[in-house]
C-alpha cells in the first residue's frame, strides 16, 4: 500500500458519521483529526464532509463560521470529500430547494433521491478506475440531477443517476463508503490531497 503518513486529513465533526471516516483515514496510514473549530482547518491537506443531516450540518457550519473557511480551503486546492450530506453541502444548486451551503461544485443535487430511511440499500457499484465493484451503501441518499460535464468528471452512476463525481480537488459521493471495509473510495480521495 502507498504511504500516506505525510497527509493530515480532517473530518468536519459538527454532526454525522465522523468516527467511521476517521477510522478509514487511519487504516490507510494518514493522520486523521476530528475538526471542531475553524482554526483547525489550516493544518490540513484535505477535509471530509461526512454524511448526516445536511440542514443541521449547514446551519452549524454557518453558526461556527465554517462556510467561508471551507471555501478558502477549496480555493487553496486542498482536497474536499463530501459523502451523502457532504455532497449536498458541496453543490452549487439543490433541486427544488433554494438553499446553497458551500456552492463549490458545478452540480445540482436532489436530496433523498432514493427514498427514505426505510428504503436504504447496498449494491455492487461499478466505479471508474476500480477493477472490481464497490459495496455502496445508500441511506436516504441524494444523487446528482444535473452536472456540468465540462468541469465535472462522473465516476459512477446508479439507475442512470450520477452518484460519484470529481471536480478538480473536490469529490462528491451519494453513498457511504465509510460504512464498509472497502477503503478504495477513501484511498482515491487521499490520492487527490
Swiss-Prot record:
Pathway where this protein functions: Cofactor biosynthesis; pyridoxal 5'-phosphate biosynthesis
The enzyme's E.C. designation: 4.3.3.6, 3.5.1.2
Cellular component GO terms, alphabetical: cytosol; glutaminase complex
Binding residue positions for L-glutamine: 52-54, 111, 139-140
Active site: 84, 176, 178
Assembly behavior: In the presence of PdxS, forms a dodecamer of heterodimers. Only shows activity in the heterodimer.
Name of protein: Pyridoxal 5'-phosphate synthase subunit PdxT
Organism per entry: Pasteurella multocida (strain Pm70)
